[in-house]
From Swiss-Prot:
This is Bone morphogenetic protein 1 homolog. One of its GO terms (molecular function) is zinc ion binding. Residues 307-419, 420-531 form the CUB domain. Its cofactor is Zn(2+). Residues 1-23 form the signal peptide. Residues 24-109 form a propeptide. Its EC number is 3.4.24.-. Disulfide bonds join 143-304, 167-189, 169-170, 307-333, 360-382, 420-446, 473-495, 536-548, 544-557, 559-572. Residues 100-305 form the Peptidase M12A domain. Residues 532-573 form the EGF-like domain.
Length: 639
């Protein structure tokens, strides 16, 4: 079929996709969260911003004439015999065009490669754990850092929210910059590789097959594409992508599979061109892990230091380049240590030799108590003296080695260890088993002593729970006590796979202990702790006008029988009862306010029967006042 037909259908499908999206959101988002389902348009699972939409519409109109010219040129080529020359352009020859499918717009990149995140409460514990594993996968190979959003931190105003929307798997590309932006993980999308792919869009990646030079590496089989989905195979404009010196990556986790949007599972929509040497078509569309090209590209996009890395294990060691030999001057190395929330980090130096200077100005090692360069400074070191051991206040440390040109030193060597447990004096936070969300380590014992401000109690809510099962929990377990002593009252000992009920202390202290033996290891647990107060014990009962019911982390207002809660959630109003007229198999419902004093009149034929909301049948109606057998309410019935 004529290529013009496919170009036209593709253009129409793309325009339609930009103007409509059918479906209702599964998870309601607040107005200040940008939902990808309400985007101006879509390219596959990519949600387009209004700016993206305008750019694509302008480009679509501009390229329509170019499509026609290209067709004419190809026809002329066939008649002149030059078509054979075009076909002989190999992949190797095309490598001179280095364009990568990542955002070219600096404002779309996350500041200092830090991406704050939230996870909606509608996800299960195993899903939340998998999201964290996907984020750790990106952290493990790049300088990108995912941190749980702190609403009090203005640096976290721009953040992502994992949610479940009607668009299924979809996300914006890069940072929108106007507050919260949703990452939809819909039905059948909650798989590790798919989430890593969606996070690729968050980082700033477009789909690999949309690069401007893609036609040199893959062919699009238009006739096999589902009608209306042709726009997903458009080539991006060079203004949207950055030329970072990387060639086409068939192995990218951002690449479509051969049958994506295909009319049939065995029909190709994208066909990789054969390797000129082996004659084999490369595999595409993997959803297992970041490719080497993905890793290189992300580090180039965020200008990650070439020296250093992110350390995610519970224990480890690291050193300056070439240790114990001298490393070259004029280097910047950054190490990011991240352990399980609820743990702290013990850092010890085993060797240290840097060129000294006043204030350690030229060559230094800096250690910061947090996830980035703006975290509180724990120390700046130089010279030949071994620094004292360092203990973090939380689960992250940031270490930077800076050396000036023409100054050579041996550098340093250090090891670290995650310390689980400890004293916690915060109003809220998270406790997790060591190595969570991966399996916990054997032979571990962690004791957390939580203290809240006076006049508050401690609330504990488990989000996920998978501990080796035993009838009496003698092997691996989580134990909670109402106080800080081993002799404090036992609230419960938990193991197995069922999430324990919410827990609260009677005072402002709680002890949480995790124990694992040397054999079976499971996924562990994640629990949120927070300050808890009995609002119902306050003089105003939390504002409730009738009944106050205290719950973990909150409270609710309720009403006595015969009353119902008003729209403000605090006051009670006289309840309405439903009465039914039952006749000839038909039950029309009448909503009649329940009288406290006085009467209500219901009219009907003598053959009708009257029942209350409890469906207790009365005698045939007569002209008299009747007391209902199932209620004390007086009703006047007239015939």
């Amino acid at each position: 079929m004529d290529l013009l037909y496919y170009m036209t259908v593709s253009l129409l499908g793309f325009i339609l996709s930009l103007t409509t999206f059918i479906g209702e959101t599964t998870r309601a988002l607040s107005d200040d969260v940008s939902s990808p389902c309400k985007a101006s348009g879509f390219l596959g699972d990519i949600a387009l911003t209004e700016d993206d939409y305008e750019r694509e519409m302008i480009r679509a109109r501009h390229n329509r004439e170019q499509y026609r010219r290209r067709i004419l040129q190809e026809r002329q080529t066939r008649t002149t015999g030059a078509r054979h020359h075009i076909k002989k352009r190999t992949i190797e020859e095309a490598k001179v065009r280095h364009v990568r499918a990542v955002t070219a717009r600096p404002e779309r990149r996350w500041t200092d490669a830090v991406i704050p995140y939230e996870i909606d409460g509608n996800f299960t514990g195993s899903q939340r754990a998998m999201f964290k594993q996907a984020m750790r996968h990106w952290e493990n190979y790049t300088c990108i850092t995912f941190v749980e959003r702190n609403p009090a931190n203005s640096e976290h105003d721009n953040h992502i929210v994992f949610t479940y929307q009607a668009c299924g798997c979809c996300s914006f590309v890069g940072r929108k910059g106007d507050g919260a932006q949703a990452v939809s993980v819909g039905k059948n999308c909650d798989k590790f590789g798919v989430v890593v792919h969606e996070l690729g869009h968050v980082v700033g990646f477009w789909h690999e097959h949309t690069r401007p030079d893609r036609n040199e590496f893959v062919g699009i089989v238009h006739q096999n594409i589902v009608p209306g989905q042709e726009y997903n195979f458009r080539v991006l404009d060079a203004a949207e992508v950055d030329s970072l010196g990387e060639t086409y990556d068939f192995a990218s986790i951002m690449h479509y599979a051969r049958n994506t949007f295909s009319r049939g599972i065995w029909l190709d929509t994208i066909l990789p061109r054969k390797d000129p040497e082996s004659g084999i078509r490369p595999e595409i569309g993997q959803r297992k892990h970041l490719s080497e090209g993905d890793i290189i590209q992300a580090n180039l996009l965020y200008k990650c230091p070439s020296c250093g890395r992110t350390l995610l294990e519970s224990t480890g060691n690291f050193s300056s380049p070439e240790w114990p030999g001298q490393y070259d001057g004029d280097q910047t190395c950054v190490w990011r240590i991240s352990v399980t929330p609820g743990e702290t980090i013990s850092l010890q130096f085993t060797g240290f030799e840097l060129v000294g200077s006043d204030g350690c100005w030229y060559n230094y090692l800096e250690v910061r108590d947090g996830h980035w360069r703006h975290s509180p400074l724990l120390g700046r070191f130089c010279g030949a003296s071994l620094p004292d051991p360092i203990l973090s206040s939380d689960s992250r440390l940031w270490i930077e080695l800076k050396s000036s040109a023409h100054r050579y030193s041996r550098g340093f060597a250090a090891n670290y260890e995650a310390i689980c447990g400890g004293h916690i004096e915060r109003e809220s936070g998270t406790l997790q088993s060591p190595n969570y969300p991966d399996d916990y380590h054997p032979s571990k014992e962690c004791v957390w002593l939580i203290t809240m401000p006076a006049n508050y109690t401690v609330g504990l809510s488990f989000q996920s729970f998978e501990i080796e099962r035993h009838e009496t929990c003698i092997y691996d377990y989580v134990e909670v006590r109402d106080g800080h002593e081993d002799t404090s009252p036992l609230i419960g000992r938990y193991c197995g796979y069922f999430i324990p009920d919410d827990i609260k202390s009677t005072g402002n202290k709680m002890m949480v202990t995790f124990v694992s033996d040397g054999s079976v290891n499971k996924g562990g647990f994640s629990a949120d702790f927070f300050k808890e107060k009995d609002e119902c014990a306050q003089p105003d009962q939390g504002g409730c006008m009738d009944v106050c019911v205290n719950t973990i982390g909150s409270y609710r207002c309720d009403c006595r029988p015969g009353y119902e809660l008003s729209s403000d959630g605090r006051r009670c109003e006289v309840a309405a009862e439903v009465y039914s007229l039952v006749y000839e198999g038909i039950s029309p419902a009448l909503l009649i306010p329940s009288p406290i004093r006085g009467t209500r009149t219901v009219s009907g034929r003598s053959s009708h029967h009257l029942t209350t909301g409890s469906h207790s049948s009365l005698s045939p109606l007569t002209s008299r006042v009747t007391r209902c057998a199932s209620t004390t309410t007086l009703m006047s019935v007239a015939v």
